[in-house]
Amino acid sequence: MEIPSYASNIQPYGSQSGTKIASENDNAKSVSLSGDNSRSVSRTDKLSEHFSEQVRARQQESAETAMAQAKQRQRLNEEQLAKMVEQMNEFVKSINKGLSFRLDRESGREVVTIYEASTGDIIRQIPEEEMLEVLRRLAREQDHRSGLLMAKV
């Protein structure tokens, strides 16, 4: 913050910092308190009790608020969990797929067939049937002409 050049540091009524006025007010209060010392002590005790009651009440309120918020978070977490489970069930139902494992006798390899459970349509075979056919042909040719296959390679 920039102070303009026309600003003055002169305090009102000729005092430099206003401390003289404040100290005069403090002396007046201390004089009146020293006259009724027993009355001021009882007033202080009452104020102290009043403040401690207020502090206890606020602590009680804050504890109750914290507990209510924790219960609400727990309810939200339970609701979110239930919603997530429902979404997972819907997802699984939408992709209701079955797996079938089959061993191909000629190649000696396992073929995993993925099909739709309701219709039985084959979605994918790993390795695919075309690849198995190629492997079968290579195996047959190798049995008959193993030397020829080696010579070509």
Curated annotation (Swiss-Prot):
InterPro entries recorded: FlaG, FlaG-like_sf
Biased composition (Polar residues): 1-41
Coiled-coil region(s): none
Region annotation (Disordered) ranges: 1-74
Gene3D superfamilies recorded: FlaG-like (3.30.160.170)
A Pfam family that the UniProt record links to this protein: FlaG
SUPFAM superfamilies in alphabetical order: FlaG-like (SSF160214)
Family assignment from sequence similarity: To FlaG in other Vibrio species.
Protein name: Protein FlaG
Organism: Vibrio cholerae serotype O1 (strain ATCC 39315 / El Tor Inaba N16961)
Gene: flaG
